[in-house]
C-alpha cells in the first residue's frame, strides 16, 4: 500500500508523509509516498486529493473500497482531518497485524470555525517535548487553535530580548503553594523555566505543520507580578514585588500612568508579534483590581486627564499601549 498526493502540492505531500509516519509507528510498515498527476489515482493505495465541490473549507470525504482509500478535501486542511480519521481507524499497536477496514464513506465537516485548547505554562511549566505532544493531541482531535498562556503572576515564560530580566528574574519563584490557594503551606522548592524565542518559533512551525494556529497570551494589566518583580518601576508602589508562589488575584498591577509601563507593553507586543504570526494576541484583561490605581496619584491624574468616570473605562486605559 502506498500513499499518493497531487504532484507539486507540498502541503498534500506533507499530509501524506505525516500519515505514512503514523502508519509506520502503529504497524511497523512504512507506506511509500508518491506524487501523481492532477486527477490521477492509484489502485490499492491511499489517495489524497482536493475537491472543490466539498462545501466546507475544513470538510473532507473519506471513501474506502476494495480498490483503495480516497481522502478528498476542499483544502489541504480538510485532507489532513481526513487523515486523522483514518489514523483513528488503525489500532494504536498493530505491529505485524493485518488491518481490515470496512467499505464505506465518511463525510465530515466542523461545526465550529474555532476549535481550540488552552494551556497554562505559568503556574506549571511544561518542557518543549510536552508542548509538541499536546499539539499532537490537538491534531488528533481536529483542533485548529492552541492558546498558549505564557505570562502570569506565577511566572513569565517567554523570552523578551529587550527586557532580559523578565526571564532572568520573572521566570523563577522561590516555592509553590501546596493544596488550595493561599493554604499557607509551601513546598520550599525553587521553580522556574521559560522558552527562548527560537523554541517558541519551533512550536509555531510544529503547530503550523498540523494546521494549528498558536495564539499567545500575555496577561495584562493584572496578573503581572512576575513582570513587576523584574521591573518594579512599572508598578504603582515601586515594590518590592516577588513572583507569586500562590494562586489567586493580587492587587499589584501595571501603573497606567507610568510611561515606562506603556512603553513596556509596546515593546513586548512588538516582539511577540514577530514570534507568533497569529491574527490574534490574547491580552487577558481579567481580574485586574483597581485598588492600587485608586491610591496612586499618577493613575488618578491620568484618569482625570482622560475624563474617565467608570471603572470599566479605567480598565480600558490600563490595557491600551500609548
For each feature predicted by the language model, list its residue ranges.
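Contiguous, structured surface segment used for ligand recognition
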Residues: 1-114
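Conserved, mostly hydrophobic/aromatic
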Residues: 23, 75, 117, 138, ...
Amino acid at each position: 500500500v502506498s500513499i499518493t498526493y497531487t504532484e507539486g502540492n507540498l502541503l498534500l505531500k506533507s499530509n501524506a508523509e505525516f500519515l505514512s509516519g503514523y502508519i509506520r509507528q502503529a504497524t511497523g510498515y512504512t507506506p511509500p509516498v508518491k506524487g501523481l498527476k492532477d486527477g490521477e489515482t492509484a489502485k490499492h493505495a491511499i489517495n489524497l486529493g482536493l475537491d472543490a465541490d466539498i462545501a466546507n473549507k475544513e470538510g473532507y470525504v473519506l471513501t474506502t473500497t476494495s480498490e483503495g482509500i480516497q481522502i478528498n478535501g476542499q483544502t489541504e486542511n480538510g485532507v489532513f482531518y481526513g487523515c486523522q480519521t483514518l489514523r483513528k481507524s488503525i489500532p494504536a499497536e498493530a505491529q505485524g497485524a493485518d488491518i481490515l477496514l470496512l467499505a464505506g464513506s465518511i463525510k465530515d465537516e466542523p461545526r465550529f470555525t474555532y476549535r481550540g485548547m488552552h494551556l497554562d505554562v505559568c503556574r506549571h511549566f511544561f518542557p518543549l517535548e510536552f508542548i509538541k505532544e499536546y499539539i499532537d493531541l490537538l491534531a488528533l482531535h481536529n483542533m485548529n487553535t492552541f492558546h498558549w498562556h505564557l505570562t502570569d503572576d506565577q511566572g513569565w515564560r517567554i523570552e523578551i530580548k529587550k527586557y532580559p530580566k523578565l526571564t532572568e528574574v520573572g521566570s523563577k519563584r522561590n516555592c509553590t503553594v501546596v493544596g488550595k490557594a493561599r493554604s499557607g503551606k509551601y513546598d520550599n522548592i525553587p521553580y522556574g523555566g521559560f522558552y527562548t524565542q527560537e523554541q517558541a518559533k519551533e512550536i509555531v512551525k510544529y503547530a503550523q505543520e498540523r494546521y494549528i494556529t498558536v495564539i499567545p497570551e500575555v496577561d495584562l494589566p493584572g496578573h503581572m507580578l512576575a513582570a513587576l518583580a523584574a521591573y518594579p518601576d512599572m508598578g504603582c508602589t515601586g515594590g518590592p514585588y516577588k513572583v507569586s508562589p500562590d494562586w489567586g488575584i493580587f492587587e499589584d498591577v501595571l501603573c497606567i500612568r507610568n510611561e515606562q509601563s506603556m512603553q513596556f507593553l509596546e515593546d513586548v507586543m512588538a516582539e511577540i508579534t514577530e514570534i507568533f504570526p497569529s491574527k490574534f494576541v490574547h491580552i487577558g484583561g481579567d481580574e485586574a483590581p483597581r485598588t492600587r490605581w485608586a491610591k496612586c496619584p499618577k493613575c488618578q491624574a491620568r484618569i482625570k486627564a482622560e475624563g474617565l468616570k467608570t471603572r470599566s473605562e479605567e480598565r480600558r486605559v490600563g490595557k491600551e499601549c500609548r
